[in-house]
Design a protein with these regions (language model features):
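Conserved double-stranded beta-helix
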Residues: 1-48
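Short, charged low-complexity intrinsically disordered segments located at boundaries
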Residues: 12-17, 23, 98-100, 134-138
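Catalytic core of Fe(II)/2-oxoglutarate
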Residues: 42-137, 143
Length: 146
């Protein structure tokens, strides 16, 4: 066992992203996703992930998806034999001369009223946090590092 989650069904949503080149400053600063997992269909360059302390471009490969693990999954696997780290990433701003960028993003997040549990590889409980408390801490850290 690596960890667990208890509460309602959580939230999942599908986001159709459109980065309009008429607003060339659109982009996303470095961040990690709060939830469990994010699945992305990347159709144009611009997504970068942090590898060895440096941001690198994620290649656009037709028919392939990118998967980001989030902070909730990182939290529940912290004491396991195989910790799943949250992926720090960013989306570059576009220039007005770039083609319009589209993407499809699926987010799977725990219910804010739920509890995340941590277990070690032998199944012993190691800790827990309410999802709301964990997300509040992550938001505080993100705000302080702007």
């Amino acid at each position: 066992a690596s960890g667990g989650y208890s509460a309602g069904a959580g939230t999942t949503f599908l986001n159709f992203v459109h980065y309009d080149t008429r607003n060339p400053d659109q982009g996303l600063r470095p961040h990690t996703d709060y939830g469990l997992i994010t699945i992305l269909d990347i159709t144009a360059p611009g997504l970068q992930i942090k590898v060895n302390n440096k941001f690198e471009e994620v290649p656009v490969l037709p028919g392939h998806l990118a998967i980001h693990f989030g902070e909730a999954l990182n939290f529940i696997t912290t004491h396991s034999d195989r910790t799943v780290g949250a992926i720090e990433h960013l989306v570059l701003s576009q220039k007005s001369t770039d083609p319009v960028r589209h993407g499809i993003v699926y987010f799977a997040n725990p219910d804010l009223g739920g509890v995340l549990w941590q277990f070690d590889a032998q199944g012993r409980g190691k800790g827990s946090s309410s999802v709301a408390d964990l997300f509040a801490l992550l938001e505080k850290n993100l705000t302080e590092h702007r």
